[in-house]
Amino acid sequence: MTARYERSAALYERAVARIVGGVNSPARSFKSVGGGAPVFMARGQGPYLYDVDGNRYIDYIGAFGAGMFGHGHPELVAAVARAAEGGTIYGTPNPWEVELAERIHQALPSMERIRFVTTGTEAVMSAVRVARAFTGRPKIIKMEGCYHGHSDFALIAAGSGPSQLGTPDSAGVTEGVAQDVITVPYNDLDSLGEALDVWGPQVAAVLVEPIVGNFGVAMPKPGYLEGVKRLAHAHGALLIFDEVITGFRVAYGGAQTLLGIEPDLTTLGKIIGGGLPLAAYGGRAEIMDWVAPLGPAYQAGTLAGNPLCMQVALTGLEILSRPGVYERLDADAAYLADGLVRSARSHGHTVQLGRAGSMFTLFFCDEPVVDYRTAQRSDPAKFAAMFRGLLDRGIALAPSRFEAWMLTVQHTRADLEETLQIADEVFAQMAGQ
């Protein structure tokens, strides 16, 4: 590692001695972009990150989708200070959780009843549990390559075909768990129908990202989500939308509002916390009323609904509800993404674009990405070269070809212009290698 990252390298040496792999989430590791020490950030301001060596970066990591507001947003900073003065955790109900639940229901009417949790993993795990309780069925169908957190059932890879049960995709996940998970390709109604024809009477729910953000950004084909809902309901299964990434990202009311399709249950996370750890799950009242204390599906959390997160979340949603916010984000993302595509292609690189609102992915492959298998064709070496070239010039991306570029409410057109100029230099350098 060069002198530019000298302090990051020193911190990484210390980190690997006490923190597993030197990082607190594998997504932060540089393993897939050539290895070595990741960059350690010391502070953020607006759309910028500053590392421990004093280097400035235009931030498109966006905290993997959670950082919709940029860094140090003055209204959120004030909300944190104001809330903290009144105490950060009570262990009792509080008025702000009621107000936040009402605000979320206004944005996503399908969420008639809501329960707050701390992480997206908890939200999905809890939604699946109540779906199983409500239907009395054990199995879940999910889509290949879609990440739903790190609970055991979510870490099941596809079997040899849509009628086959999955296999564990992580050490420590048992074959017993895998027996209750079927994985089929995204955007493939035939495979979903085949799986339901075989396992339908045992399937509690079909779990899907309505717009994929976890193998890069991929949109549903026309009619796909309508077909998923129709097939699920025809077999007595529920439809769960995992909107941990897309909720309040692609539209104020998430993908379900943007696309006009309501699920039975929804999970939210990332953005709703305003930068603090907060997630939620909810849906039709008749289903959610199976959750304790009303029903037999148990779920609880010491930090759930704490007053600090509730008040900051309310401030965040107030910011996002203002006129023109999403229109500007969409226009800025289109400007940047389209400019990157033109630049890359002008230097001879074959790229495909997946974009939904203010998140997008550049895939280094020769055909549009519609599912995980086409996403895997994106050239890892080319992504790594782009990632490193941008990083060395002050542009920060998530270190994976399957992650999205994330815009914030604090990026300006000047930031986008600077990014395009730097990216053009990088694409030119890559073409000459």
Curated annotation (Swiss-Prot):
Keywords from the named record: Cytoplasm, Isomerase, Porphyrin biosynthesis, Pyridoxal phosphate
Listed name of the protein: Glutamate-1-semialdehyde 2,1-aminomutase
Keyword Isomerase: yes
SUPFAM superfamilies hit by this protein: PLP-dependent transferases (SSF53383)
Pathway(s) where this gene product acts: Porphyrin-containing compound metabolism; protoporphyrin-IX biosynthesis; 5-aminolevulinate from L-glutamyl-tRNA(Glu): step 2/2
Catalytic activity: (S)-4-amino-5-oxopentanoate = 5-aminolevulinate
The organism's taxonomic lineage, starting at the top: Bacteria, Bacillati, Bacillota, Clostridia, Eubacteriales
Domain of life, source organism: Bacteria
GO molecular function: glutamate-1-semialdehyde 2,1-aminomutase activity; pyridoxal phosphate binding; transaminase activity
Keyword tRNA processing assigned: no
The EC number(s) this enzyme carries: 5.4.3.8
GO biological process terms held by the UniProt record: protoporphyrinogen IX biosynthetic process
Subunit structure as annotated in this protein's UniProt entry: Homodimer.
